[in-house]
């Protein structure tokens, strides 16, 4: 649904209104998991819908026993098959975890997934003053549209796997959501990093990129502002534009880089235009699509969080038209017009492929999917 005064809501044929589908159900699932978090979606060229979620076996806590599950549909969402895509390393039955997936589809069709891995209690960015000993970033890949997955590859044990990591790194992980392949074939994954600076830990948004189909990566530099973290990027005319969580600011920040993440500056058309309430910010999604008239648009999902703190209510989708910035940032719809669960909620992920638009989002311990293609059709009629 959308705000009743929203142009897109007024023009939507009620018979085409998207209906939510519970993909990962905390009350009915094959793992007896009590909670699901961190949704991720990729729409594939052959029509396959591939989604992911943290299996939070014992509840919403970040510092717990967690694996990453996949849900896969080859019949446009009518039926789904479930699997564990990445398992934690089973060192500690309370705290071993892989979590917060970030995915990308390369030009070869390979699907790459990276996730953070830990084995002890404590916040990934703030618990230690030196590089955390139980931390790693793990990568897996699939060459059969998500049917099977490779063994885990440790990107942090061998420094040659990810070049240009700062010496004052506490830890890093993916930006949570999806990456892109640039027009020249470079794979770009959003990332977030914790650094030790002036006797305190600060966290920032950045990217990693690969020019060899994910075999090795190079880390870009941090954005100008700390308290940024989970982000996604799109390519526009060879530049990277980032939309990112920005804690305690009350809005989503936006940056642009013309040198593959070496330097970043504020991207004014999007920076501060999407409000996210008081207190902690929240993850969001940011993808690019093209309309029928050839306009390049950005689609952003994020909670409005009108009640502040961790309620993260009203997960909404917004649009910016890069070829007509005079329109500003427009609200498209609110797929989840409810309060989030303050113990864990508000996250979402968008995907666009072959004129189809989909979203997955957190819904009080479940992960729901909606086909938002009817709204994309309305965008085309603007």
UniProtKB/Swiss-Prot annotation:
Q: InterPro entries under this entry?
A: Sialidase (IPR011040), Sialidase_fam (IPR026856), Sialidase_sf (IPR036278), Sialidase_trypan (IPR008377)
| Enzyme class, UniProt record, top EC level | hydrolase
Entry's EC annotation: 3.2.1.18
Q: Which UniProt keywords apply?
A: Glycosidase, Hydrolase, Repeat, Secreted
Per the Swiss-Prot or TrEMBL record, the active site comprises 62 (proton acceptor), 347 (nucleophile)
Q: Which SUPFAM superfamilies match?
A: Sialidases
Q: Catalyses which reaction?
A: Hydrolysis of alpha-(2->3)-, alpha-(2->6)-, alpha-(2->8)- glycosidic linkages of terminal sialic acid residues in oligosaccharides, glycoproteins, glycolipids, colominic acid and synthetic substrates
Main location per UniProt? secreted
The biological processes this protein is annotated with in GO are: ganglioside catabolic process; oligosaccharide catabolic process
Q: Which GO terms describe its molecular function?
A: exo-alpha-sialidase activity
Pfam families for this protein: BNR_3
**Residues binding substrate, per UniProt:** 37, 245
Localization recorded for this chain is:
Secreted
In the UniProt record, does the keyword Metal-binding occur? Answer: no
What Gene Ontology cellular-component terms does the record carry?
cytoplasm; extracellular region; intracellular membrane-bounded organelle; membrane
Disulphide bridges, residue numbers: none
- Tell me the ranges holding the BNR repeats: 71-82, 140-151, 208-219, 255-266
Record-linked PANTHER family = EXO-ALPHA-SIALIDASE, SIALIDASE
- Function text: Sialidases have been suggested to be pathogenic factors in microbial infections.
Family named by the database record: Belongs to the glycosyl hydrolase 33 family.
Q: What is this protein called?
A: Sialidase
């Amino acid at each position: 649904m959308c705000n009743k005064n929203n142009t897109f809501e007024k023009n939507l044929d009620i018979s085409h209104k998207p209906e939510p589908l519970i993909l990962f159900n905390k009350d009915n699932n094959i793992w007896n998991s009590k909670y699901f978090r961190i949704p991720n979606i990729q729409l594939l060229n052959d029509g396959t819908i591939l989604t992911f979620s943290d299996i939070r076996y014992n509840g919403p806590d970040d510092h717990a026993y967690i694996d990453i599950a996949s849900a896969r549909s080859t019949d446009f969402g009518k039926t789904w098959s479930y699997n564990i895509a990445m398992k934690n390393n089973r060192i500690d039955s309370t705290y071993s975890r892989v979590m917060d997936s970030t995915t990308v589809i390369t030009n070869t069709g390979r699907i790459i997934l990276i996730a953070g891995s830990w084995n002890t209690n404590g916040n990934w960015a703030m618990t230690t003053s030196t590089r955390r000993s139980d931390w790693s970033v793990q990568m897996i890949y699939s060459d059969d549209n998500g049917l099977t997955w490779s063994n885990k590859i440790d990107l942090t044990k061998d420094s040659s796997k990810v070049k240009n990591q700062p010496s004052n790194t506490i830890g890093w992980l993916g930006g949570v959501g999806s990456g892109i392949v640039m027009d020249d074939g470079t794979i770009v994954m959003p990332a977030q990093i914790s650094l030790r600076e002036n006797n305190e830990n600060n966290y920032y948004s950045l990217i990693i990129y690969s020019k060899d189909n994910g075999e090795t990566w190079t880390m870009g530099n941090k954005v100008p502002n700390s308290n940024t973290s989970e982000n996604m990027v799109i390519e526009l005319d060879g530049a990277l534009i980032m939309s990112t969580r920005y804690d305690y600011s009350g809005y989503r920040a936006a940056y642009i880089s013309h040198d593959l993440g070496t330097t970043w500056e504020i991207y004014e058309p999007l920076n501060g235009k999407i409000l996210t309430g008081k207190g902690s910010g929240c993850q969001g999604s940011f993808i690019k699509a093209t309309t029928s008239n050839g306009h390049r648009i950005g689609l952003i999902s994020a909670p409005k969080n009108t009640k502040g703190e961790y309620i993260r209510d009203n997960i909404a989708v917004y649009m910016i038209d890069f070829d007509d910035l005079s329109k500003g940032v427009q609200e498209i719809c609110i797929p989840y017009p409810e309060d989030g669960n303050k113990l864990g909620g508000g996250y979402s992920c968008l995907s666009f492929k072959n004129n189809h638009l989909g979203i997955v989002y957190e819904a009080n311990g479940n992960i729901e999917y909606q086909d938002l293609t009817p709204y994309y059709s309305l965008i085309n009629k603007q």
